[in-house]
From Swiss-Prot:
Subcellular location: Cytoplasm
Lineage per the UniProt record: Bacteria, Pseudomonadati, Pseudomonadota, Gammaproteobacteria, Pseudomonadales
GO CC aspect terms: cytoplasm
Protein name: Glutathione S-transferase
Keyword Protease on entry: no
Tree of life domain: Bacteria
Organism of origin: Pseudomonas sp. (strain M1)
Length: 15
């Protein structure tokens, strides 16, 4: 589940 880590470390959709 690397996507979760990447997503968590990449708050691009953190409106």
């Amino acid at each position: 589940m690397d996507y979760l880590i990447t997503f968590y470390h990449s708050p691009q959709t953190n409106s």
